[in-house]
Amino acid sequence: MAKRFTLSEAQRLIPEVDRMLREALDAKSEYQDAERVIQEFTEHVMMMGGVLVDRDRALAARSLRDEAASRLRERIEAVLETGCLVKDLDIGLVDFPTLFRGVEVYLCWKLGESGIGFWHGVDEGFRGRKAIDQDFLDHHQGDRPQ
């Protein structure tokens, strides 16, 4: 069973999740840059019929790509280990499972927002976000202490 958060529990995780998402986005950008260099080498070789390329530079690009992919994977896994769900890395969209009136819903946060101010049903997604109001505050709950 997935962890369910209270609003305050999820809010406390925001600084850590923010940092990890930014690190993941940096790694993704580095991966894409290295992949472009590799693609350029590949296209150059194909166009020139196997002409020699700067082997050291090509190997360095592959190494950078692989290191960035590893960092990206590690950062995403670290975010997921907190119990929240990465819905869209590119915009930094994260959901935190919770219960509202006994039904599982998600607290919704996006990179750049100062805190969690929205929630939505599990099938509604970002477009179905609703502002957290007093009714939600009065009737949502995380996991019960064991």
What is each residue range found by the language model?
Residues 1-44:
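Long, hydrophobic N-terminal alpha-helical segment
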